[in-house]
Amino acid sequence: MSEAELLQAVEAHRWLQSLRLRPNLVTSGVVPEARLVAEESALLDPLNLTGAHVLEVGAANGFFSLAARRRGAARVVATDHLAWTLPGADAQSATQWAAHALDLEVETLALDPRGLSADFGSFHVVLATAFFEQLFNPIQALRGLRSVTNRVLVLETLQNELADVRPMMTAQSRIMPFGGADGSWISGWAPNPPLMLQLLRDLGFNRVLYRNHPTLGAARGIYAALLPEAPDGLLAGFEAPWINMTSPPAG
Amino acid sequence: MTLPASRLSDDDLRARMKQFHWWHSMALRPGVTTFGGKPELLLAQEEQAFLGPFDLTGRSVIDIGAWNGFFSFAAKRRGAGRVLATDSYTWNHSAFRGREAFELARDELGLDVEGLELDPTEIDEKVGLFDVVLFIGVFYHLYDPIDALQRLRGITRQLLLVETHQDLMENPNPGMVFYPGDILNHDATNWWGPNPALMLHLLLQLGFTRVFYRDHPTLGRARGTYAAFTPEVEAGLIQQLGPPWLDLDVPGAVEALLARG
C-alpha cells in the first residue's frame, strides 16, 4: 500500500475513532486520540495480554483491538454490530484499512453480541466498550459475552442513577455518529454500579472490579469481571483507582 | 362454543380442586369456588379494568402466564374467537400443578379454551399471530423482560395488554429497578420494577404506535396496565378508553401522570 493509497482511504472513510496510522497521520475520528489513549491504559494496563486470545465487541474502528495486538495478544477478533451494519456504515472497512496500515493482524467480523454463544469460540479476554448505551437488550448481550469468556470480561459503559443504592438502569435514545449521513437514533441503557455487580455475579463472575472512566469520571464506568477459572494472580494488575466490588470474593 | 359439562359430583369436584394450589378464585359451579390466592371480587375488578374497554367478539386472544386461566376464560365469555391459554412456570410447578388446575376449571366451565405449555422466553412466530395478547402479572417475573416484550410484539396483531408491578415512580426518566434474590415481597421470582416512562419507551421502540395507561383498580400506582396498539389496530376493538385510562404517548403525559400522584 502506498502512502497515497492510505491517504485516499483515510479521506474516504468516516472515522469514529482517532487512530494514529503514521507519526503525522491521525484519522479525524469523533473520539479524540487523547481520550482513547487514556481509555486504553485504563482498560488494558491491568492485564498481561501476551499470547492471549482477545475478542472486542463494539470495536468501532478497532483502536483497542489494535492496542491489544500491540500488547502481545496472539489472536484478536474485532467485532461490531450497528456501526458496521447500518446502511451507510463504513467503520468495518475503516478498521481493516487501519489494521493494514499498521501491519497488525486483527480479524474483523460484523456481529450482534446478542447472538453470541459458546459455538463462536472461547477468549481469555472479552472487551466491550460503550456497551449498554447502544443495546436495546443488554441483558441478552451480556449473556452472549459470558458465553465466549473464559477468563476476564472488561466492560465500559455509560452510567446513571449513581446516587441510588438500588440496582437499576435507565433507558434513552440518542443520535450515534454512524449509519446515515446524520447518524442514527440508537436506543440503549445506562446502568448503575449496583446493577452491574448483580448482573455480572448472576452470570458466574465471582470477582468484579470497578473504576471510573479515566477522563469522564463516574459518568462512565469500567468493570473487570473474572470467572472462577481466572487465577488470583490476575488481580495483581488492578491497582488503584480500581476497587474490588466483591471483596471478599463471592462464593 | 361451550363444551359438554363435567360429570363430577360436587364432592368429587371439591376433592379434585383440593389437589392443586389455586391462584385464581373462580366459581366453577353454584356454591363451588376454587380457593385461590386472589379473591373473586379482586379478579372481577381486574377483569373489568383490563378487558372492559375492548370488544373481543370474534377476536383471537393469547394469554401469556395464564396460570389457572381466569383471564382466558373471561376473554372467552366476552365473545373472543380462538383463545389460547399458555404458561410454563406454574404449570410445571410440582405444588401449583397449574395446568391440571386450568384444565379442571376449563372442563368444568365448559369453555372452548386451548392450553399450550409455553415459556415467554421461547415465544416466536411459530405460535401464530393474535389480535390480543394478554401479558398480565408476568413482566416483573422475568429476568429478561425486554426479550419477552420483543417476542410478544412479534405475535401481536392489534393489542398487547401488559399489567405489571411498578417501581421508580418518583423518576420521570425511563428506568427499572432490579431485585436480587427475594428482596421484593420475599419472592425470588420477582426481578424488575419498571416505571411508566420506561414501559412507554419500550413499547414505542418495539413499534407500537399508541400506548394507553391506567393504575391498578385497587392497588393504584403500585401496579400499572398498558394497552399498546399496533398500527393495524381496528377501530372496533376499542369500545371505551376514557378515564382512568390515560393516553401516554403524547408530550407531557408521563409528567402529568406523576404530578397526579
What are these regions (language model features)?
Chain A
Residues 131:
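Hydrophobic adenine-recognition pocket in adenosine-nucleotide-binding enzymes
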Residues 1-122, 170-172, 193, 218-251:
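Conserved N-terminal segment of class I S-adenosyl-L-methionine
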Residues 114-116, 123, 127-128, 136-251:
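S-adenosyl-L-methionine-dependent methyltransferase catalytic module, highlighting the catalytic core
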